[in-house]
From Swiss-Prot:
The lineage of its organism: Eukaryota, Viridiplantae, Streptophyta, Embryophyta, Tracheophyta. It is found in: Cytoplasm; Nucleus. The keyword Phosphoprotein does not apply. Gene3D superfamilies: 3.30.420.100. This is Large ribosomal subunit protein uL18. SUPFAM superfamilies: Translational machinery components.
Length: 302
């Protein structure tokens, strides 16, 4: 059979339906989103929260978001660039920093809802899988993990943030199969390996390797660590202090930046309909009063 080119007729273009904008841009997986935001119909106006984690080259963002007709509403958010306030000034995009960011968000949202005393979570980060138990008074805060468009590979930083949120006291349905240290052959999580990743042990091991094998690369690759005076043996203690500082005060600090100055306008401001109407009335009143004044002057002359 000969190859026949598909002809796009007028009927094809008349019936063509354009996909959603964020699908065309490759930003949203609507098949996953609709399953994350659809709420049970007998729950009426109850929001369905998502634990959203996004990573970039210099930052890790974790947010608690609910969907509405007008758009997504952010209940709370935490960023890895906030971690210097808690004592972590380097390595803000690795697995350990993702854990700290998830922990910060969990403690922040529970503090906001006045549930931080009831749900302390897993204070000692042992690397074991942890799920929060319901208290007698209020149920734990529940959210669903939203990973976006990333590949959900074992040991991804998104699951580091998930582990931090779980240890922080949030109720998030999950499996331990994607945490760092899960062995596919043994079908179980290696707790020691996972704990090593939570406390930056993989970074410390790489630092030691470079110091022995490639000192020049170590000087350039870990220049910020060297500048801050942080050594490989100090990383675990550093992360323990950061976790304690986050639990002590998770509230977001307001920025010290001054308010932007109001710029001088050189073009005329466009008036609204009511302002134009009021301005016309003023001009008419002024003209009428001027006309009345001229009439009075004429009468005086006569």
């Amino acid at each position: 059979m000969a190859f026949a080119k598909a002809q796009k007729t007028k009927a094809y273009f008349k019936r063509y339906q354009v996909k959603f904008k964020r699908r065309r841009e490759g930003k949203t997986d609507y098949r996953a989103r609709i399953r994350l935001i659809n709420q049970d119909k007998n729950k009426y106006n109850t929001p369905k929260y998502r634990f959203v984690v996004r990573t970039s080259n210099k930052d890790i963002t974790a947010q608690i978001i609910s969907a509405s007709i007008a758009g997504d509403l952010v209940l709370a958010s935490a960023y890895s660039h906030e971690l210097p306030q808690y004592g972590l000034e380097v390595g803000l995009t690795n697995y350990a920093a993702a854990y700290c960011t998830g922990l910060l968000l969990a403690r922040r949202v529970l503090k906001m809802l006045e549930m931080d005393a009831e749900y302390e979570g897993n204070v000692e980060a042992t690397g074991e899988d942890y799920s929060v138990e319901p208290a007698d008074t209020r149920r734990p805060f529940r959210a669903l993990l939203d990973v976006g468009l990333i590949r959900t590979t074992t040991g991804n930083r998104v699951f580091g943030a998930l582990k931090g949120a779980l240890d922080g006291g949030l109720d998030i349905p999950h499996s331990d199969k994607r945490f760092a240290g899960y062995a596919k052959n043994g079908q179980q999580l290696d707790v020691e390996v996972h704990r090593k990743y939570i406390f930056g042990g993989h970074v410390a091991a790489y630092m030691r390797t470079l110091m022995e094998d490639e000192p020049e690369k170590y000087q350039s690759h870990f220049s910020e660590y060297i500048k801050k005076g942080i050594e490989a043996d100090e990383l675990e203690g550093l992360y323990k202090k950061v976790h304690a500082a986050i639990r002590a005060n998770p509230i977001a600090k307001k920025s010290d930046k001054p308010q932007p100055k109001a710029h001088k306008r050189y073009n005329l401001k466009k008036l609204t309909y009511d302002e134009r109407k009021a301005r016309l009335v003023e001009r008419l009143n002024a003209l009428n009063s001027a006309a009345d004044g001229d009439d009075d002057d004429d009468e005086d002359d006569e």
